[in-house]
Amino acid sequence: YGIEIEEKAYGLATTNMLIHGDGNSNIKFGSCFDCKDFIKQSDPVIILMNPPYNAKPIGIPATYKANWGKAKDGKEDPTKGLVFIHYLSDIIQEMNEEREKNGLPRKTVKMAVLLPVSTAIGTKNVIQEEKIAMLEHNTLEAVFTLPNEIFYPGASVSACCMVFTLGEPHVKADGTMKETFFGYYKEDGFKKKKALGRVEQFDENGDSKWKAIEEEWLRLFRNHKSVDGLSATAEVSGENEWLCEAYMKTDYSKLTEGDFQQTLNNYLAYLMKEGKIYES
């Protein structure tokens, strides 16, 4: 099952399914906001989503724009994609209410969603309101900071992956909450190649660097293990930052003189840009 509003992406998705022998892919062409019944009928257990980060507000239901102010008539979605998670959360909540009326137990749904880092950092205005609303009925299981230019040669936005359990409140009835796992997953063993994109690298034995890195990342996540410079766990609310960089400890053993010099260069460039010092 799937929903895609961009025509070329929809064509690629359906063609790919046909090539792999699936003649009934159940991929809908259109806006997810017009596919509520389709989503409910699919009865999802796992949702993978990459919402648009700059969707036009005109295509978003008015009920989700009540607190947007002038932005509701603007050119871009001020939530940077969070509103799409809110919408799916509401559908799962509605499904659970219907299940309870029919004497059935509530269900939970795992969701992994790609979003710009700005949504994880945001602690003000509309983005914070969306984060607070999300945790009312859902649990933030993990947030992974992804490699720079993950979409190369496409969009250059810095992205993260958020993992939620929909249908399970972040704060339990007794007031406690589960610690969220944060991964600083910047180095994945791929390198940028012009005209090729991000290319997988191999070691001297011909083994995939990514495969070894992937296994380590999954091990840390499954065990909720904190490793300096790579991962951390913390209790968070919608008012906090949702990025590993805010909680992990620095692994000083891996710092080099080059890292120190680069930091100084970046700071010097910032001072010059702000007009606080001038090149002589």
Where are the model-predicted features located?
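A conserved structural/catalytic subdomain of Rossmann-like adenosyl-cofactor enzymes
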Residues: 41, 48, 53-280
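Conserved S-adenosyl-L-methionine
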Residues: 1-46, 54-58, 117-118, 130
